[in-house]
């Protein structure tokens, strides 16, 4: 009778251990899905921000002279490139 109880106890212990592992796996996957959802929301927000910035840029281009805007954009890009290459040359 004691041997039978010991076997049943070992079986029950194995089942409890399996249940713990399954529960931990479910918890881990739920955390992964939560992380994925947060990343998706973040990228969605970034996409909306870029879209709004683009719309605002084109609205400014339409209202102001194109030549003046393009000159300003080229000056900004040129300045960034000059700073970038100058910093590489000095450091």
Swiss-Prot record:
* Membrane-spanning ranges: 69-86
Q: How does it sit in the membrane?
A: Single-pass type IV membrane protein
- Name the CDD domains on file: SNARE_Bet1
Give residue ranges on the Lumenal side.
87-91
GO molecular function term, any single one: SNAP receptor activity
Where is this protein found? Golgi apparatus membrane
Keyword set includes Transport: yes
Does the UniProt entry include the keyword Magnesium? no
Query: Which GO BP terms, alphabetically?
Result: intra-Golgi vesicle-mediated transport; intracellular protein transport
Record's keyword terms, sorted: Golgi apparatus, Membrane, Protein transport, Transmembrane, Transmembrane helix, Transport
Q: Which residues lie on this side of the membrane: Cytoplasmic?
A: 1-68
The free-text function statement in the UniProt record for this protein reads: Vesicle SNARE required for retrograde transport within the Golgi complex.
Q: Which PANTHER family match?
A: GOLGI SNARE BET1-RELATED (PTHR12791)
Assembly and binders: Component of a SNARE complex consisting of sed5, gos1, ykt6 and sft1.
Q: What is this protein called?
A: Protein transport protein sft1
Query: What is the species listed in this Swiss-Prot or TrEMBL entry?
Result: Schizosaccharomyces pombe (strain 972 / ATCC 24843)
The primary gene name is sft1
């Amino acid at each position: 009778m004691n041997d039978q109880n010991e076997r049943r106890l070992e079986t029950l212990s194995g089942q409890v251990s399996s249940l713990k592992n399954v529960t931990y796996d479910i918890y881990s996957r739920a955390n992964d899905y939560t992380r994925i959802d947060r990343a998706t929301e973040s990228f969605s927000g970034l996409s909306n921000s870029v879209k709004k910035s683009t719309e605002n840029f084109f609205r400014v281009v339409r209202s102001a002279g194109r030549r003046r805007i393009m000159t300003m954009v080229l000056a900004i890009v040129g300045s960034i490139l000059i700073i970038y290459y100058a910093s590489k040359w000095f450091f």
